[in-house]
Amino acid sequence: MNARIGVITFPGTLDDVDAARAARHVGAEAVSLWHADADLKGVDAVVVPGGFSYGDYLRAGAIARLSPIMTEVVDAVQRGMPVLGICNGFQVLCEAGLLPGALIRNVGLHFICRDVWLRVISTSTAWTSRFEPETDLLVSLKSGEGRYVASENVLDELDGEGRVVFRYHDNINGSLRDIAGISSANGRVVGMMPHPEHAIEVLTGPSDDGLGLFYSALDSVLAS
């Protein structure tokens, strides 16, 4: 079986090519999905990549969540499809109600573009099963609205249910409880602000630590 990973492109998406390259790097077929498509083209998993979908008008991810392709993604999630939202994709997943909380302006109100260290907290997701708990990853962060916020009840629930997937070592954007990524209750949907697709080889990125997410998704698809 050849796993097919769909990568969505919205107007304003920047990192779809990188996400598709990461999928191919682990041996999957990368399938392009346009925002106006009402068909997931038979893919086994979906990546909602980073950028500025629809120019981030109204609010980051607010318009993208209403697109035909996201209607299909929401339906597919109900059937257990693995979905990864990266940066703006994380914002889209929160706006679509697939993940709790929201992403707001960074502390200091500056755009941040630098490599950061993350710690893997949960390996019980479709996107992190290849990692050992407490593994440290070096990946890129580039966002102006990357500060994760949620109510204390939601934060307690995420911690209590093991749904915090990544935490920052150096919390430079002010995310509550150092949260860099979270998952759905069943671990099939993961959202994260840093960019694993930019860390798939040391020649072009800070490390190859991001490959583990895409290999994990491959394992999940092939095991199902």
From Swiss-Prot:
Reactions catalysed, as given in the entry: N(2)-formyl-N(1)-(5-phospho-beta-D-ribosyl)glycinamide + L-glutamine + ATP + H2O = 2-formamido-N(1)-(5-O-phospho-beta-D-ribosyl)acetamidine + L-glutamate + ADP + phosphate + H(+); L-glutamine + H2O = L-glutamate + NH4(+)
Active site location: 87 (nucleophile), 195, 197
Enzyme nomenclature, EC number: 6.3.5.3, 3.5.1.2
Matches recorded under SUPFAM superfamilies: Class I glutamine amidotransferase-like (SSF52317)
Compartment(s): Cytoplasm
Database matches in SMART domains: GATase_5
Residue ranges of domain Glutamine amidotransferase type-1 in the record: 4-224
MF annotations from Gene Ontology: ATP binding; glutaminase activity; phosphoribosylformylglycinamidine synthase activity
Gene3D superfamilies in alphabetical order: 3.40.50.880
Pathway: Purine metabolism; IMP biosynthesis via de novo pathway; 5-amino-1-(5-phospho-D-ribosyl)imidazole from N(2)-formyl-N(1)-(5-phospho-D-ribosyl)glycinamide: step 1/2
GO terms, biological process: 'de novo' IMP biosynthetic process
Keywords carried by this UniProt record: ATP-binding, Cytoplasm, Glutamine amidotransferase, Hydrolase, Ligase, Nucleotide-binding, Purine biosynthesis
GO cellular component labels: cytoplasm
PROSITE patterns to which the protein is assigned, alphabetical: GATASE_TYPE_1
Oligomer and partners: Part of the FGAM synthase complex composed of 1 PurL, 1 PurQ and 2 PurS subunits.
UniProt xrefs under HAMAP family: PurQ
Job of this protein: Part of the phosphoribosylformylglycinamidine synthase complex involved in the purines biosynthetic pathway. Catalyzes the ATP-dependent conversion of formylglycinamide ribonucleotide (FGAR) and glutamine to yield formylglycinamidine ribonucleotide (FGAM) and glutamate. The FGAM synthase complex is composed of three subunits. PurQ produces an ammonia molecule by converting glutamine to glutamate. PurL transfers the ammonia molecule to FGAR to form FGAM in an ATP-dependent manner.
Name listed for the protein in its UniProt record: Phosphoribosylformylglycinamidine synthase subunit PurQ
Naturally occurring in which organism (per UniProt): Mycobacterium leprae (strain TN)
